[in-house]
């Protein structure tokens, strides 16, 4: 077989295998047997081995259908920032958006807009060089996302190669799970006794972050694209409408609806029509995206710190559904607060099944006049939290029963006390309070002890191995090995995570300890103001009131907790266990999780730059691999640059590296370098 004959057959096989991948993984409707599929794949692999010049990173032999690939999810910096969108929730706010544009441009509307479905999925960025896909990443914080290239390549409509595009190109879009695929996936998970996803967006996000791309491929993910980052100027495009058609012509899926509108009134007409059709769409849409159609106006208007001035998300109103309140259960939180939770007849609202709703407190129930057996109107507050809007009293039959508050704690039986509107269990030994306190302490935003899940916390409490969070640091491997389903490796991993949690710093510790009214922001402010736990413990009420965002009620709650002998004893035992009680310097872990390689000559001594990177939490290695986050390129770079390009590793100039450090630390490099 000649090279040209092999090339022709290889291209035929790749197209054929991709088609059957689509039939099997996305449609779940294969046309050939597994044996026939394996034969095609084997033939392709043999030809690529025989003619190595025909190998390609976008070949099916490198993707799903070959041996399993391990996704790395390394941090990756977007060449240009990915912004969020500001929101409009009604026509008046849409009109205000148009008026702001008019003032900024110095001329009156109406303006021409492109209106697009706002698909509720996961934002992604595809980066191409010379028409070849180098990597794909999630949006992350807009500047740094996670690389998910291998999993994105399981979506058959994403082009691996494109022709006639700028040399460097970023294509932005949304990965989503169609409603039908979501319902099918949840049925499968339910049958296996596994945890189901709450909504299609969560399912898409969870599926895109699977370590085994073959699992991702079976989930039926789709993608739709709508924007360019790098390459927009070079494309020569004049309007957003042209851009969407250009994306389709280049082979990118544009699966969401779009239309052109004149002025806010024109947008409103499209919005109202699409709102009526919302539930007939194959995907979840939570509104429309309105963009000025003329791209030259984008450059004039620019961006705020978080969003473009030329675009806005016009959100659909929260969906409301009728259902029945079947019963009320009472839950005890980590502070002892007792919260009534309504159990509803399950109802599908805005993409997920709602079967529980918080009823907050006694006053809320009285004001709502809700009873067990009532028909209620439910929506999702902010599109997220289920909430009872009102009671449908016209549907009452007389069989409804008033909600009775318990006099004793539903968990420990201790008599409840009432503090204003709140019923509280005062028992310090209440198992529910202990459970919630430990669960909160171990949560990701607190001390981040990932291996300490709810079931394990329950077991530790049942066995008497822990009574509070300080006891976590006294756990030994022998204690854990005595627990059901706890092997040696799991025990070692948990103990390692507990040990690592000691160094999270004062900010995370204050949030983890659950001081009254102290969330993430207030914990940060307290840590920055006082610096150490000792200084905070000595603080007067007046000093607490000087902290940013601390009001009188919050200050009093914090002060009373700090003076509580039980709290002070807990802090003492945590300190004895080695938990860090000081605030971290900003930037101390600014580059944690990133791996750097340096090539070429820098303006500073290379060892000095390496030391700086390590001091900021980064790892520095001598060789480029797929695990490399960035290659820092100086003058006269070596072969590492070619390897980085081949592997799709992002590069930074020395100046870009220092800019990254300054952004992450908030300090000039000169003050950080030793």
From Swiss-Prot:
Transmembrane segments: none annotated. Keywords: DNA damage, DNA repair, DNA replication, Ligase, Magnesium, Manganese, Metal-binding, NAD, Zinc. Zn(2+) binds at residues 409, 412, 425, 430. NAD(+) binds at residues 34-38, 84-85, 116, 139, 174, 291, 315. Thermostable. GO terms for molecular function: DNA binding; DNA ligase (NAD+) activity; metal ion binding. It comes from the Bacteria. The active site is at 118 (n6-amp-lysine intermediate). Residues 586-674 form the BRCT domain. GO terms for biological process: DNA repair; DNA replication. Its cofactor is Mg(2+); Mn(2+). InterPro entries: BRCT_dom, BRCT_dom_sf, DisA/LigA_HHH, DNA_ligase, DNA_ligase_AS, DNA_ligase_CS, DNAligase_adenylation, DNAligase_N. One of its GO terms (cellular component) is cytosol. Its EC number is 6.5.1.2. It catalyses: NAD(+) + (deoxyribonucleotide)n-3'-hydroxyl + 5'-phospho-(deoxyribonucleotide)m = (deoxyribonucleotide)n+m + AMP + beta-nicotinamide D-nucleotide. NCBIfam families: dnlj, PRK07956.1. Belongs to the NAD-dependent DNA ligase family. LigA subfamily. DNA ligase that catalyzes the formation of phosphodiester linkages between 5'-phosphoryl and 3'-hydroxyl groups in double-stranded DNA using NAD as a coenzyme and as the energy source for the reaction. It is essential for DNA replication and repair of damaged DNA. This is DNA ligase.
């Amino acid at each position: 077989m000649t090279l040209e004959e092999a090339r022709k057959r290889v291209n035929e096989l790749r197209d054929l295998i991709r088609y059957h991948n689509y039939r099997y993984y996305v449609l779940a409707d294969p046309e050939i047997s597994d044996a026939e599929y394996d034969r095609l794949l084997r033939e392709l692999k043999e030809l690529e081995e025989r003619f190595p010049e025909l190998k390609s990173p976008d070949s099916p032999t490198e993707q799903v259908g070959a041996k399993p690939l391990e996704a790395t999810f390394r941090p990756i910096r977007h060449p240009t920032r990915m912004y969020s969108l500001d929101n409009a929730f009604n026509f008046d706010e849409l009109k205000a958006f148009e008026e702001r544009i008019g003032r900024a441009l110095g001329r009156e509307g109406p303006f021409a807009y492109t209106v697009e479905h706002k698909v509720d999925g996961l934002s992604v960025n595809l980066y191409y060089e010379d028409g070849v896909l180098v990597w794909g990443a999630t949006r992350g914080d807009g500047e740094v996302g996670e690389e998910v290239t291998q999993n994105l390549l399981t979506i058959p409509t994403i082009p691996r190669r494109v022709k006639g595009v700028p040399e460097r190109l970023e294509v932005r879009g949304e990965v989503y799970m169609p409603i039908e695929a979501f319902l099918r996936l949840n049925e499968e998970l339910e049958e296996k006794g596994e945890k189901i996803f709450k909504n299609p967006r969560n399912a898409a996000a969870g599926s895109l972050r699977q370590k085994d791309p073959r699992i991702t491929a079976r989930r039926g993910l789709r993608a739709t694209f709508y924007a360019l980052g790098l390459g927009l100027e070079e494309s020569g495009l004049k309007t957003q409408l042209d851009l969407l058609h250009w994306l389709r012509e280049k082979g990118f899926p544009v699966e969401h609806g779009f239309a052109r509108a004149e002025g806010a009134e024109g947008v409103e007409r499209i919005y109202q029509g699409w709102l009526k059709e919302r539930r007939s769409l194959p995907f979840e849409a939570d509104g429309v995206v309105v963009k000025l159609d003329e791209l030259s106006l984008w450059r004039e208007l620019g961006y705020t710190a978080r969003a473009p001035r030329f675009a806005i998300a016009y959100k659909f109103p929260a969906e409301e559904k009728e259902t029945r309140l079947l019963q009320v259960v009472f839950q005890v939180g980590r502070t002892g607060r007792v919260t009534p939770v309504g159990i509803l007849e399950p109802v599908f609202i805005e993409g997920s099944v709602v079967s529980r709703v918080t009823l907050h407190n006694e006053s809320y129930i009285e004001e709502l006049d809700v009873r067990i057996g009532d028909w209620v109107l439910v929506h999702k507050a902010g599109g997220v939290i289920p909430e009872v809007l009102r009671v449908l009293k016209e549907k009452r039959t007389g069989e409804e029963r008033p909600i009775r508050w318990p006099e004793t704690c539903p968990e420990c039986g201790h008599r409840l006390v009432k503090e204003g509107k709140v019923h509280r269990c005062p028992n310090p030994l209440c198992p529910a309070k202990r459970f919630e306190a430990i669960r909160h302490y171990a949560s990701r935003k607190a001390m981040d002890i990932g291996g300490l899940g709810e079931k394990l916390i329950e077991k530790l409490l049942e066995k008497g191995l822990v009574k509070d969070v300080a006891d976590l640091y006294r756990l030994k491997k022998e204690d854990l090995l005595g627990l059901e389903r706890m092997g040696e490796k799991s025990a070692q991993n948990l103990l390692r995570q507990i040990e690592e949690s000691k160094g999270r710093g004062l900010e995370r510790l204050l949030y983890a300890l659950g001081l009254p009214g102290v969330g993430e922001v207030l914990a940060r402010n307290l840590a920055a103001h006082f610096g150490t736990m000792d200084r905070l413990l000595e603080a007067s009420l007046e000093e607490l009131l000087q902290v940013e965002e601390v009001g009188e009620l919050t200050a009093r709650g914090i002060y009373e907790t700090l003076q509580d002998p039980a709290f002070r004893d807990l802090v003492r035992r945590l300190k004895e266990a080695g938990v860090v009680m000081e605030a971290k310097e900003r930037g101390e872990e600014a580059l944690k999780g990133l791996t750097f390689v340096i090539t070429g000559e820098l303006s500073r001594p290379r060892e000095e730059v390496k030391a700086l990177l390590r001091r900021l939490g980064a790892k520095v290695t001598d060789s480029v691999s797929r695990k490399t986050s960035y290659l820092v390129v100086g003058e006269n770079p070596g072969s590492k640059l070619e390897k980085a390009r081949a592997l799709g590793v992002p590069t930074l100039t020395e100046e870009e590296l220092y800019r990254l450090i300054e952004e992450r630390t908030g300090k000039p490099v000169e003050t950080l370098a030793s």
